[in-house]
Regions:
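Domain-length cofactor-binding catalytic modules of enzymes
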Residues: 1-165
Length: 165
């Protein structure tokens, strides 16, 4: 759950920003819901609710667009959709196979902290952590296209800056 501090942080750098609505959703949770005439627990792991007319967000990678969406309430998906583009490669694979140069090119024009040393263990230890690089994720446009029966895209958001905290 957000506390409102993120609004203060954004307003500090962009004072003219006007927050109309906050979209705050979870992507790993279980909820008691009614589906097919029965009360059931729906466990959404990397997914989020997409009930009829419910507003949500499907984020892309730090270098790709994100989408504000409206749920279509598709019962076949238990009224769910993906929460994000999803990984194309594991964190370790990204940090051991991608190069800083290609990751920097993918982030060209987007304000962000550049890559830090990997804090994990094994093959990636001591290398730069490229695990969140855009190339590690699926193409958000393909993801949105594949979910047209689950959500209606309302707004396409293009990243200007990427903050990690």
């Amino acid at each position: 759950m957000r506390t409102g501090h993120e609004r203060v942080g954004v307003a500090e750098f962009v004072p003219e920003v006007n927050f109309i609505r906050t979209i705050d959703i979870h992507h790993n949770y279980a909820a008691c819901e009614e589906h097919f005439g029965k009360k059931v627990f729906v466990h959404r792991k990397g997914a989020t609710s997409a009930k009829l007319d419910e507003i949500g967000i499907i984020p892309g990678s730090m270098g790709a667009a994100s989408y504000i969406v409206r749920g279509l309430g598709n019962p076949d998906s238990f009224m769910s959709c993906s929460h994000g583009a999803g990984r194309r490669m594991s964190r370790i694979a990204a940090s051991t196979t991608l190069t800083v140069e290609e990751c920097d090119r993918a982030m060209d024009g987007i304000v962000c902290e550049r890559w830090h040393k990997y804090k994990g263990y094994g093959k990636a230890k001591g290398k730069l952590d490229l695990s969140e690089a855009p190339q590690a994720y699926k193409d958000i446009e393909d993801v949105i296209a594949s979910e047209r029966d689950l959500v209606e895209p309302l707004v396409r958001l293009v990243p200007l800056a990427s903050l990690k905290g």
